[in-house]
Amino acid sequence: FGEVYGEARVGLVVPQYVTIHSINELEANKDRFSSEIVGIDAGAGIMKTTDKAIAAYGLDGYTLMTSSSSTMLASLKKAMDKGEWIVITGWTPHWMFDQFDLKFLDDPKKVYGDLEEIHAIAWKGFSEKDPFAAEFFGNIKLTTEELSSFMTAMKDARMDEEEIARKWRDEHRQLVD
């Protein structure tokens, strides 16, 4: 069917109020960040890439902290509540971008690569079996904000997935009609 989302990205993420804009600036500001990059599970691909970024950008004074996603996000919330500087491993799409005012640090050495895409695909004959769904998936294009808001709804939901999807669809009619 084609691209549904064209802003998929991984990298290092900071709150918007942090005044640096590039991974190049981390070393000079390591005291502000307590010399830590807060990450997720040790075996995750983003953690391996962050180890490469630490080497590529000469961030020898930094420690990459392993934790769970939920612990990383709790650390982010705690730091942001206090207005402290924090750098985490991050990716889009993710609901954290709907909940927190965040930005990716520029990666001039492209250690984390370029933007990626999410595509809708289906089995042969799907379009004939469900032409409405095929048209929907062929036409829908989501932004980070739209996809993050849907992911937040799924995370926070106290209802089943179908109800969440219907509610989100009704609130985003311009995307699905």
Identify the role of each PLM range.
Residues 1-43:
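A conserved helix-loop-strand patch within extracytoplasmic ligand-binding domains
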Residues 4-11, 70, 93-144:
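Periplasmic-binding protein-like
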Residues 17-20, 42-46, 92-96, 126-127:
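Solvent-exposed loop/turn segments at secondary-structure junctions
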Residues 28-64, 167-170:
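Ligand-binding cleft/hinge of the Venus flytrap
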Residues 46-108:
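Ligand-binding pocket segment of bilobal, Venus flytrap-like solute-binding proteins
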Residues 140, 144-177:
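C-terminal functional modules
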